[in-house]
């Protein structure tokens, strides 16, 4: 490129400036930030300090394995420099800095995954302070700034300047100003009505509120004036210097005035002679004050820490705008030493189960030195919503990711963290209201834990809450269910489905409800995976009411009656199986139906209808498994239902009656739908129903219709076998 060949002393800087357009979503976000009124604009400073802290974390982590990375600047700090004259606020850090490519990509041309989600949240009325959670905190600078300049130096690149007034584009150029060594300087050119953020008191207030627990010194630079007593000679010297400065700044018309002042001073000198008088002058100086001297909160005694302090630390750690729901602060001593401070947020993040998201939100420290915040081995994935810090005394400072994977120390820390998290959830469960909030947000995590963590499955199962056929609008634990079980009840009965109403009205729960047996309603897709692993609770087996072999508490008389019904309908079962062929594995007399004529159940080890629906929705499903697992369907018939009884009579009177076949297929397809399955050929089923409607309305099938296209559809309908006998069809209804 031509600009690369130009030397710095060539006055061709304009050609070195490159202009880029903001990516559409980012431009939209900036427009939203600039043109909407937000009352809590102060969060911009929290976001920029947080970004600086992240940059410092990165260079410190790199320096652990390669100390030469800090040759460009050993001190790791953040400086805040307000300038009232220029109306600028500058945030400087000695972090990792950005290359030219980083500047272009990170600040404008590549949208983060959270950009769109944040805009949707904002438009839905969410608070602007959520911005950091979506990874787009930098743009909050435009809440207070009309123009932002970013000067940055990375060890692997030259010093560059990025600049934008948010007009849909930004510029990047090589920076020829004062060399930075390494790091990033964000200069905010404040709007006229936002000068409060140049006030010392206001900056201190914001840092204390949002950033006092940042792990690097945050220093405020403020220009102040003080009185200084000096002798006349020194005062004159100082005044001369000031006059020199004025000479440079003022135009030529000011020159005589300056000369007059000088001659006056000479006269004064003559009058005073050798007398040396003391004189007070105003001296400007830069005051530096560290704003976050607070000791790391996790190293303090939990008894000395207030809820407010925990809340402030949680907010500074997570950029959350709400308080935490629960906190666990503990230390482990003995062979292994570490301290941990864990928080449960009030709500799940928008991308909780996204694969691209980092696997956990716990910062790992070694002897108060930050190491990393995305150590996957620190906590299992199902606890990825837990926020906090872990500070180990035993891990080496220069530990690498590879070493962490093999570290026995880390395995012990992980085991302890999981144990303490489960303790925290159990404590939370004692407060019904708070646990309800927790469970609404994180029930999927608990269920994922049951699927993945065999060691803690029992403890996790105690945290489960479900609606049941007897609980109304309240969710109950498995322990509550067990205390309400009937005397002769051996199993915990459950049904899986899409909604509470759907499973409550299901044919599968009819007889259980009639007998006063409580059924658990599992209505989240993850419940299917959860119960695959959770076989029993407190010695009671979990039994799906939609699978074959359902055993209900029965007395001898009921068993005898059931056997008689099986014998009576044995022939009909055989005929139905022959008609349905491979569609079902078998046809049996049901002991679970009361008002429905029939239902489809699955084999003990096959998928339920709900699981089949979930698996069909998987984009990367294995069709061979689909065929194997989904094929095991059993048709159960209700021997007490008039439709089934009449069908038995028809079949026994004339087993070659052609209407029987069509009715059996219609019953099977309807049972598929009512049992939660989908039809392979819905149109054929619909045509059968239309034919039934015609018969019910007494319309002659051969009647010509006004619309030729309708006639064509009628021709394609599958014929109702034996439809010459309409009266027999009506008899079944």
UniProtKB/Swiss-Prot annotation:
Residues 285-621 are annotated as: Interaction with FNIP2 and TSC1. ISGylated. S-nitrosylated; negatively regulates the ATPase activity and the activation of eNOS by HSP90AA1. Residues 730-733 are annotated as: Essential for interaction with SGTA and TTC1. It catalyses: ATP + H2O = ADP + phosphate + H(+). In the resting state, through the dimerization of its C-terminal domain, HSP90 forms a homodimer which is defined as the open conformation. Upon ATP-binding, the N-terminal domain undergoes significant conformational changes and comes in contact to form an active closed conformation. After HSP90 finishes its chaperoning tasks of assisting the proper folding, stabilization and activation of client proteins under the active state, ATP molecule is hydrolyzed to ADP which then dissociates from HSP90 and directs the protein back to the resting state. Residues 9-236, 272-617 are annotated as: Interaction with NR3C1. The modification Phosphoserine is found at residues 231, 252, 263, 454, 477, 642. Pfam families: HATPase_c_3, HSP90. A motif (TPR repeat-binding) lies at residues 724-733. ATP binds at residues 51, 93, 112, 138, 401. Transmembrane segments: none annotated. Coiled coil: none annotated. It is found in: Nucleus; Cytoplasm; Melanosome; Cell membrane. The modification Phosphothreonine is found at residues 5, 7. GO terms for cellular component: cytoplasm; cytosol; melanosome; mitochondrion; myelin sheath; neuronal cell body; nucleus; perinuclear region of cytoplasm. Residues 683-733 are annotated as: Required for homodimerization. This is Heat shock protein HSP 90-alpha. It comes from Sus scrofa (Pig).
